[in-house]
Design a protein with these regions (language model features):
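C-terminal helix-rich "cap/oligomerization" subdomain common to oxidoreductases
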Residues: 36-38, 103-132
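Generic alpha-helical secondary structure signal
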Residues: 6, 11, 99-101, 105
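Generic low-polarity alpha-helical segments
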Residues: 10-13, 62, 74, 128
Length: 132
C-alpha cells in the first residue's frame, strides 16, 4: 500500500511468497518481491513475520536522494546532494487504525481509499498468490 501510495501502480517481476516458519498462523510469513514502477523506478519489497527484531522500514534510493523511514522508531532521514535532514515524528502507532475504525462506524468516508484503489491492491495480492 505504501509503495502504491507514493509511486503509483507497479508491475511485478519476481516473487517468492511462502510459509517457512513454525509459527502457528494460517498465512504465508515470507515475501520477497521485485518489480518496476512507471518511469523506470524499481522496487524490492521484503516482508517476514518471524524476525525477532520488530522492523517497519522504508528505504528509497535515487540518483540525488536517499530516504530512510523507520516506522517503529518514528523517524525519517533524507539525504540529498548537500545535506542530511533528520525528522522525528511524535505519533501513536495505533492512531490511524483507531481513526479508521471510528470513521467507518460513524460513516465518515472522506479519507478512505476508493473502490478502485481497493481493487488495485487486491489485484496485486492475487498476482503475488499466482507466483507460488
Amino acid at each position: 500500500d505504501y509503495l502504491r501510495w507514493i509511486f503509483g501502480d507497479f508491475k511485478i517481476k519476481y516473487v517468492i511468497n511462502k510459509k517457512i516458519s513454525d509459527l502457528k498462523i494460517n498465512t504465508d510469513d515470507f515475501l520477497c518481491l521485485t518489480g518496476k514502477f512507471k518511469k523506470k523506478i524499481y522496487l524490492q519489497l521484503n516482508l517476514n513475520y518471524f524476525t525477532r527484531e520488530a522492523k517497519r522500514q522504508i528505504l528509497i534510493d535515487g540518483k540525488d536522494l536517499s530516504i530512510s523511514a523507520n516506522l517503529i522508531n518514528k523517524n525519517m532521514i533524507f539525504h540529498d546532494k548537500k545535506k542530511i535532514y533528520k525528522i522525528k515524528y511524535n505519533f501513536n502507532r495505533d492512531y490511524t487504525y483507531k481513526e479508521q475504525h471510528r470513521n467507518i462506524m460513524n460513516k465518515k468516508f472522506t479519507n478512505c481509499c476508493t473502490l478502485k484503489d481497493a481493487q488495485n491492491v487486491m489485484s496485486i495480492i492475487n498476482k503475488i498468490r499466482k507466483f507460488k
